[in-house]
A protein has these predicted regions:
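Beta1/beta-strand and adjacent pyrophosphate-binding region of the FAD-binding site
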Residues: 9-19
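N-terminal glycine-rich dinucleotide-binding loop that anchors FAD/FMN and/or NAD(P) in oxidoreductases
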Residues: 49-72
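Flavin-dependent oxidoreductases
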Residues: 167-177
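Conserved N-terminal helical subregion
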Residues: 59, 63, 73-156, 161-167
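Glycine-rich FAD pyrophosphate-binding loop
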Residues: 12-14, 26-48
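Glycine-rich nucleotide phosphate-binding loop and flanking beta-alpha elements
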Residues: 20, 43, 149-151
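A generic structural signal for short, well-ordered alpha-helical segments in conserved domains
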Residues: 24-25, 114
Length: 177
């Protein structure tokens, strides 16, 4: 005689970014109930934004979250040049048989996760209005993935130091698939 006891866990995730969606999908795959709270934003999604991802992370994402192989652009060769010496090549990474890493468009993985989550009976999107402690008492775990959330501002804002003294260059690369 075997009795199977199933613990029903309910998780609250704050924020609707790529991290929160991937986490929600991984939990839903384990049949854990997830409510994802989001704030309505009037920002446009940058369709040219890409993410670099290593082979081991691709394998993990495919196994635990969702298959992203069709979205990937493999990178087998990387060359780094310097502006100071007439565009002289200073570093070169190359691997003929394996990919160094891959890139994918942020918007594509974001949209795929939303579509898959909406199909699950274990997942709900909920609009975040105002923090009330009583709204969160029914959850076994609350995960905050949104640095702009009022809970973060209330309890952790003095803990973060921000120094954005960096420069980033971006480009759109045409290549054969």
């Amino acid at each position: 005689f075997l009795v199977k006891i199933k613990f029903i866990m309910k998780v609250c995730i704050l924020g609707d970014n790529l991290t929160s969606l991937a986490l929600a999908k991984a939990l839903v795959k384990k049949e854990i109930f997830v409510d994802l709270f989001y704030e309505k934003k009037n920002t446009k999604i940058d369709t040219t934004r890409t993410i670099g991802i290593s082979k081991s992370n691709i394998d993990f994402f495919n196994r635990e979250i969702t298959n992203i192989n069709k979205m990937l652009w493999p990178i087998k060769k990387i060359k780094i040049f310097t502006e100071n010496s007439n565009d002289k090549e200073i570093l070169k990474f190359e691997d003929q048989k394996d990919n160094l890493f891959s890139i994918l468009q942020n918007q594509k993985i974001f949209n795929q996760l939303i579509i898959e989550l909406k199909k699950s009976k274990f997942f709900k999107f909920k609009k975040y209005i105002k923090y009330r402690k009583s709204d969160y008492l029914s959850y076994d775990l609350i995960i905050n993935c949104d640095i702009r959330n009022e809970i973060t501002k209330k309890y952790f804002s003095k803990k973060f130091e921000k120094e954005y003294n960096s420069i980033a260059f971006t480009t759109i690369i045409d290549h054969l698939k």
